[in-house]
Amino acid sequence: GNAADLDRKALGRIVFSDPDQRRWLEALIHPVVRERFQHELAELRDEPVVVLMIPLLFEAGLDVLCSEIWLVDCTPKQQLERMIQRDGLTKNEAQDRLQAQWPIARKRDRADCVIDNSGGVNDLLAAVNRCGLRADGTTW
């Protein structure tokens, strides 16, 4: 890439190790992200269901855009291992990112449905299907 390309890994190291830098970046980015989601949702307003996948939903204050919140959950050990594997982070970098997030218990309390992703794919699909069941027996 060229000099204008964003080095996401370097930026992540900076903002997740320094709370002041993270707050500064969030103050710049979160309003732009919110505006983008509001625009996308307006375009999709006639759809019966719209799914948003937002890693920092509560932290960014984007939960107000949602009529229902499903939280995908796993053990802290799995969360750390998955971040290291998926994002190529060191253990310390992954821990810094987790420390920057709300505690999972706080997120669980605000979720309408918690999807346990600590097992296999079939367990995950069953958990998603349980969240999709409505009180009247219909699904999404």
Regions found by a protein language model. Name each.
Residues G1-P48:
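ATP-dependent small-molecule kinase phosphotransfer cores
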Residues L6, L28-I29, C74-T75, Q99-W102, ...:
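Short beta->alpha linker loops
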Residues I14, Q21-W24, V50-M53, E68, ...:
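Residue-level recognition of specific faces of alpha-helices
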Residues D20, V32, L57-F58, K77-Q78, ...:
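Short alpha-helical
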Residues R34-L44, V49-Q85:
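ATP-dependent NMP and nucleoside kinases share a basic, alpha-helical "lid"
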Residues R36, V64-L65, E81, Q85, ...:
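Small-molecule kinase domains that catalyze NTP-dependent phosphoryl transfer to phosphate-bearing small molecules
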